[in-house]
Amino acid sequence: MVAITSLAQSLEHLKRKDYSCLELVETLIARCEAAKSLNALLATDWDGLRRSAKKIDRHGNAGVGLCGIPLCFKANIATGVFPTSAATPALINHLPKIPSRVAERLFSAGALPGASGNMHELSFGITSNNYATGAVRNPWNPDLIPGGSSGGVAAAVASRLMLGGIGTDTGASVRLPAALCGVVGFRPTLGRYPGDRIIPVSPTRDTPGIIAQCVADVVILDRIISGTPERIPPVPLKGLRIGLPTTYFYDDLDADVALAAETTIRLLANKGVTFVEANIPHLDELNKGASFPVALYEFPHALKQYLDDFVKTVSFSDVIKGIRSPDVANIANAQIDGHQISKAEYELARHSFRPRLQATYRNYFKLNRLDAILFPTAPLVARPIGQDSSVIHNGTMLDTFKIYVRNVDPSSNAGLPGLSIPVCLTPDRLPVGMEIDGLADSDQRLLAIGGALEEAIGFRYFAGLPN
């Protein structure tokens, strides 16, 4: 068995032949088998993975590009190896032969299909408590949620079952589970990554995203997926101007999250970061106008189109009838039973509220001369499995989905890049993540800033395997 480190470090070990690709793969397989209770993985092909590793070792190219690195793919992304099911019964045997472009680009660079990650059914939730495939468990505490909807990928990366993973993010689904599991989650600018052959929620908002152990690993994967091979120059902390929009993003935080944010800001300020306290005008109003109307209207249309294109034997009705998770069924059935968003509401959201939200971000960054904004990824840490509809937060019963996505939703609706970085553990040893957002197409600059912040913060923990 070999010591499992980051993706970047593993590539260096493979290049130096400190261990073989097969030795790495056997170690990861053993870890996956030891961590079955997390229910992070939906599908695997260990024999196929071993054959691929042996082939790489014979050719002697391990560590070149991504050669020899097994990755976890969320179960709504076509890999050509594992079923593309979105973890819902009607699609459980749907296995497209052609992979998505995001998977194909990684495979072309030498990455291996390591596993398919369990997820919130049809990506429509943030707990990954899936009544069809079972709840994914948080590797820091198996009684708690890992976040979602890419919860299986986050749990697999956090417990080092896989060296990295690809999820999808409509409004939170990469960054939130990364934060709750203590790893890094990156949502790129909308359109930076190809989104074909992925079971959709909302084409206006959906994008593949990266979950990894550190920012350096995200940079490696981003470079390959986006096709931007140039290196990102390091960014010094001194001189960075980072916005703190305290109203909205810092409202009603869990006490542990508030302390983590305060401590992180103080640490970074002492290292030379200039923080600008300024609120984003009309953010709540614009975000509410752009958020749910777009996602709820587009979901049935987008899913029907996907089924027409790729799964001719399964109808939209088959999928909806087969849904097992009550929270997802309630949302889906509402779109069928006459409570759906009207075309007029959708057009207003997409062509009025959304452009105004985007313009508001641009003006905010320009007026305050900002490099990024910083805020807690989620207002609260991971909570017990089963609180899918409501959760008590600071003494008040709140909608689980809305409180968890509150901070990450606005930039999703604006199509902006966001990077969640773990900053500390609470006294209960639960991770807290903080997110930096940038303007559209500032992805590489944002990753460079994230790398500098990560180094300064110095989070050095990982979850380990369940007992």
Curated annotation (Swiss-Prot):
Cross-referenced SUPFAM superfamilies, in alphabetical order? Amidase signature (AS) enzymes
Q: Does the keyword Cytoplasm apply?
A: no
A GO MF annotation of the entry reads: hydrolase activity
Q: What is its EC number?
A: 3.5.1.-
Kindly identify the residues recorded as the active site: 74, 149, 173
Q: In which pathway does it act?
A: Plant hormone metabolism; auxin biosynthesis
Q: Entry's InterPro entries?
A: Amidase (IPR000120), Amidase_CS (IPR020556), Amidase_dom (IPR023631), AS_sf (IPR036928)
Which keywords fit this entry according to its UniProt record?
Answer: Auxin biosynthesis, Crown gall tumor, Hydrolase, Plasmid
Query: What's an example GO BP annotation here?
Result: auxin biosynthetic process
Keyword Hydrolase carried by entry: yes
Q: What does this protein do?
A: Hydrolyzes indole-3-acetamide (IAM) into indole-3-acetic acid (IAA).
Stated family: Belongs to the amidase family.
Q: What is the protein name for this chain?
A: Indoleacetamide hydrolase
* Organism annotation: Rhizobium radiobacter
Which gene is the coding source of this polypeptide chain?
tms2
